[in-house]
Amino acid sequence: MKQLTSSQVRQMFLDFFKEHGHMVMPSASLIPQDDPTLLWINSGVATMKKYFDGSVVPKNHRITSSQKSIRTNDIENVGKTARHQTFFEMLGNFSVGDYFKKEVIPWAWEFLTSPKWLGLDPDKLYVTVYPKDTEAYHMWHDVVGLPEDHIVKLEDNFWDIGEGPCGPDSEIFYDRGQENNDVAEDDPENFPGGENARYLEIWNIVFSQFNHLPNGKYVDQPHKNIDTGMGLERVVSIIQDAPTNFETDLFMPIIKETEKLSDGKKYAANKEDDVAFKIIADHVRAVSFAIADGALPSNSGRGYVLRRLIRRADLNGQRLGIKGAFLYKLVPVVGEIMKSHYPEVVDQQAFIQKVIKNEEERFQVTLSSGLNLLDNIIAEAKKSDDKTVSGKDAFKLFDTYGFPYELTFEAAQDAGLKVDKKGFDEEMKAQKERARKARGNLQSMGSQDVTLMNIKDKSEFEYGTLEEKHAKLIDIVVNDKLVDKADGEHATLIFDKTPFYAERGGQVADHGEILNQNGELVARVTDVQHAPNDQNLHFVDIILPLEKGQEYILKVDQKRRRGLKHNHTATHLLHAALREVLGTHTHQAGSLVEPDYLRFDFTSLEPMTKKEIANVEKIVNEKIWEEIPVKTTVTDPDTGLKMGALALFGEKYGDTVRVVQIDDFSTEFCGGTHCENTDQIGMLKIVSESAVGAGTRRIIAVTGPEAYKYVTDRDEILKEVQDEVKATKAEDVTNKISSLEEDLRASQKEAEQLKAQINKAKAGDLFNDVKQVKGLTVIAAQADVEGMNDLRELADNWKSSDKSDVLVLAAEVNGKANMVISLNDKAIKAGLKAGDLIKTAAPIFGGGGGGRPNMAQAGGKNPAGLKDAIAKVLQEVEEKQN
């Protein structure tokens, strides 16, 4: 068998199929771009759906790829079995109506066994086929030459997920020998395709030749397809003679680096530690690539998966004796292993590390307390009759300590316990309900949904000119009912065509007027929203009666529309500038386009520096002043992506999309309204940059007249400050302020020195009144001071005065009670503790406090009780002495 690295195996696979006329397709992002049904890309074929369903015709009907994939449905098995992973690579070759069984089966055999390629021992290869698939059997036996006892017929070898394309499949297995098995040689599961560790599945070839009809019948597909998948990690484990995937060159460098970070732990020393090493190695691969592709930790969706993986890895780091954040330190190792085919981890290494480290540090704050609570919860559950961790306890771990439910479930399972999932879900539901009530009842179109869903009439939004549009009124909704005439106060209208933009994609709706054919104002448009069937709904205040079927003149508020166009184009410029300054890992996380300002949310872990903000603003304004034409193209999503358009994560695109291009600086999918040229924006001014959540920042900016107003307002403020500080010109204001600040600091220093002298004099008076309480000397008094700081300063003076063994000082400040108690070593040796004394006294003046044995302080609401509190302390001093 050849000695090959994982990189060589990957490249060899792609080269083999390239030689057989295949187009090598780069791995798609782990984040699905055009499939809202998927959380992650989880296989090679997941990226081929558009070709197999006919929605897109590929340039080459033969395709091969090595696809990054994430699956977390069996996450609890990662580390405990030889093959389970959350992140893996799927090598695949695909035929879209081109070749079929007579080509793909011999190719698979050639790649696996030819000395030019992998050179595996043919005697160790077995295949499974569907019993009725005589063609596949013939190819394996008569053409390839596999003996009958190496071909297993299995009813399960039929790929079918319900309605749609389906067909038989053929799986290829490698015999690792009985010495690597986990069942006896005579076990009924000891065969290729059975539940055993001896026969390792390395390749699955699906022959998609039938169509499963709704009536349950199967008919031949006119165009037959091939879909294959070979797990890179599995085949590499065979090539490198590794007992599991984790002993290959894809994982071992990560495990070795983890050993260095651990408390002297070594891989292969004991089973429990090995599980932890494997989990860490797998999870750091998954999160590194997911973050490189644009995902960030959060409390929902794929962000929750990332958070769960990072925290699961950190928990296993604890088991290896690793203290604090550590997973981020393994990212460079991942990048080094994968860089030959996937440079993105190396390219974005600093950002990926920062994201992981931030998430780890957040978890570390509560990790220790959470683990202690988890141990206590498990101990209590073991004593219970039903051996179950309550849903309430599981939710507390989640809500207070950041432990995902799945981590609690795994810990409980390891301890032989169950978790009350229903109870957990009920707690979660109750919390969401509390949050909903706190937000209040938001207005929605929900009450109209039934009526609106039944409206099928077509309505077209017309981009472009803002001239008046003549349109027919085709539907009127009043009080959730369809009517033929509206003459009340409010109504919702649908026209056969409209120039009014409906709110979408962060851009708010157009406003305007509706006139009758005589030019009379009949209604004011106050909002426009999308109906369930995508018509534009015009919410109007009625002036004169409106009738269904009549022609009306629709007039958009041009000033408002201009503001919206300018600000929307500005958001595209801002997005591109942010990516240029902060890096291409920066993505849009939300936006709001209003006529008088814009708001843009973007992914970033840190606040922008003043220099970065200024640089972004400069780049945007340069593009505005370059007078660049804004080009809009209507096309299909695939063509748009090839044009370089940015697709927003989570957005679903239809068969046609609008691509907005600003030269080669910005290209985005966008359905909003835009300028014809960037110079129409005038200028942009960033008003603020702030945080809106973990990993998300927000910029608020103004353009055009609003930007001019913002600058002139600030100029007026500057002039007022200039007059106030008596600067001769605006450029001198900062120097003048610095000079005034210096004078102020000098004056404050003088005042503090004078105050210290006064306090010292007060201390002299106070410290002369010394009482003898049994074997200790005591100074106890109420002082005339301005605050607790003054009391503490008096106590500091007392320490160096050697006037007494005990100091009790009290003061009333702004209607509040304050007390300080200090003890010297003699008083402490006599059995006194300042913290205990203050806790006895504080309730008397309506407060609480604490401190160290030699110094304590307290505050309260009832200064009238200070005299009695001092007396109580003196009593305690007398009684508590040894």
From Swiss-Prot:
Zn(2+) binds at residues 568, 572, 670, 674. Keywords: Aminoacyl-tRNA synthetase, ATP-binding, Cytoplasm, Ligase, Metal-binding, Nucleotide-binding, Protein biosynthesis, RNA-binding, tRNA-binding, Zinc. It is found in: Cytoplasm. Binds 1 zinc ion per subunit. PROSITE patterns: AA_TRNA_LIGASE_II_ALA. Its EC number is 6.1.1.7. One of its GO terms (cellular component) is cytosol. It catalyses: tRNA(Ala) + L-alanine + ATP = L-alanyl-tRNA(Ala) + AMP + diphosphate. Its cofactor is Zn(2+). Consists of three domains; the N-terminal catalytic domain, the editing domain and the C-terminal C-Ala domain. The editing domain removes incorrectly charged amino acids, while the C-Ala domain, along with tRNA(Ala), serves as a bridge to cooperatively bring together the editing and aminoacylation centers thus stimulating deacylation of misacylated tRNAs. This is Alanine--tRNA ligase. It comes from Lactobacillus gasseri (strain ATCC 33323 / DSM 20243 / BCRC 14619 / CIP 102991 / JCM 1131 / KCTC 3163 / NCIMB 11718 / NCTC 13722 / AM63). The gene is alaS.
